[in-house]
Amino acid sequence: MRTVFLILAAAILLSGCVMATSFAGAQIRGRQGTRVANDFPGADLGAKINAADRDLGTSPGEILVKGGGTISTQVILSPGHTLRFSPGTYRLGTALLWEGAFLLKSGAGVIGSGWDTIIVEPAKTGWTVFQSFNDIRLQPAHSGTDSDIHISNLQVKGANPGVDGGVRQTVSLGNCHRCRVENLWLNGTGVIGVQAGGSPFGGNYAQDVTIRRNLFTRVATQAVAVVNGRDVKIDGNTFKDSGRCCLQGMTAIDLEPNDPSDIIRNIEITNNTIDSTNSNFIHGNGILVQNGVRTRGFGPVLVKDNTVIGGTLIPNSAGNVANGIYITAFTQDVKVINNTISRVAHSGIRLENTTRNYISGNKLISTGTGGILSFEITNTTDSQIFNNVVIVDPNSPLGNEVIQEAGTSARNSYKGNTGSKGSLAPNIIRP
């Protein structure tokens, strides 16, 4: 009996040791998957982050950054590594004109704690904050692909007093596949906000990109742009007070291929709010869909359930948006459904040099001033314009209730469109 008891006790003791060893091993493995960048050597936070990234090696893991500071060294984030920022202000001193302050390889991510994680763009040289690695490092530039990159939950604040039209981007995804940009606040930044698509060299393009629930305030030029992409979703974003300076053209959402080999396929623009009430000037368009390079790889495009507000519905005000939704330049197969456009200076909806569109269920309120009509269809063919409402709010009487077809337009169908006095037939103007 004593022998049996001793054997049992020994077994229990051994089992406890094994469990303790296993638990300790799990703790060690957990620690092995996380690095605190602040604890590593380096002249600035960027150098410390790179040291932590190297220490993680090829294993997946997280790099934590705490307390704010200066990032002067370009950060290169390896596959499977997530950079996680605590609250604080992180100032970029990278001074890179053609590369991002952060280059993200496939499978890398950057996550903040919320909009209290503030990354301040370089004060003098450079604007690009986040860029996919192969977009710039694989030659020719902007032709490479990366995948599974995610950026979320932080604020990027403008600091460079200069602006850079439509060349660079704050978030440059390039030809990224399965990439997400969510819950960012781009606050007064000086270049394009978020862009999907790079060079079509090698037949490459962005695919399965989601740009969702972001806030864009006073972004100097296009806030979201797609230049070469398939299956891109632009959903639930808010654009406020667009534009920085009256000399800069600005469109909140812009689909615009730059090369005849680019594609614009299966793009969805849904549930966004564009409110330019407090913009400093009439900045351009709310949503622009164009194909000036005449790529064959165009469409379909869905523009649905968006709200475009050019200004307050008050007397003697035309608003700060030119056209609410503008479909133009050899586009095709665009659906514009259930959008609300109010107090824009020019057309609420304008179709020009486009074909095979379906425009239905939209509401235009106090749009069209200065000889420009609320709803213009010019050089447009084989399109359906159904069940739209075009009215003028008495509190904001600048505007008109006119649907007009002009130019070489042909074979378009109109049904169920209404104004404040009932059924609204189009004016047909032939050359």
Residue ranges and their predicted role:
Residues 76-81, 104-108, 147, 176-180, ...:
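Short "repeat-start/strand-capping" segments in structured domains, especially the N-termini
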Residues 36-84:
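Acidic Gly/Asp/Thr-rich repetitive segments characteristic of extracellular carbohydrate-active
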